[in-house]
From Swiss-Prot:
It holds the Pfam family YidD. Signal peptide: none annotated. This is Putative membrane protein insertion efficiency factor. The keyword Ubl conjugation does not apply. Coiled coil: none annotated. GO terms for cellular component: plasma membrane. It is found in: Cell inner membrane. Could be involved in insertion of integral membrane proteins into the membrane. Belongs to the UPF0161 family. It comes from Burkholderia cenocepacia (strain HI2424). InterPro entries: Membr_insert_effic_factor_YidD. Residues 75-88 have a biased composition (Basic and acidic residues).
Amino acid sequence: MKTVLIALLRFYKVAVSPMLGNRCRFYPSCSDYAREAIQYHGAARGTYLAVRRVCRCHPFSAGGVDLVPPPNSDTRARGEADARSHRL
């Protein structure tokens, strides 16, 4: 499944992206982020991370550097811990 998803991303990068122009507000671009996320985290978790990233890429977003989290990090637990610390 990973191979199929990465092939689809390569097709998008070569065939579709040049027609749309560079619109991504983040570095790396959303398609590069998706490819890295799928390579490092597998098809299911990588796709989840990529969809979250694309949802953050909109005209009202400041953008910037947004790297794929390392494979051993649990982003959900970290986010929940941050939310708890803000409630204190």
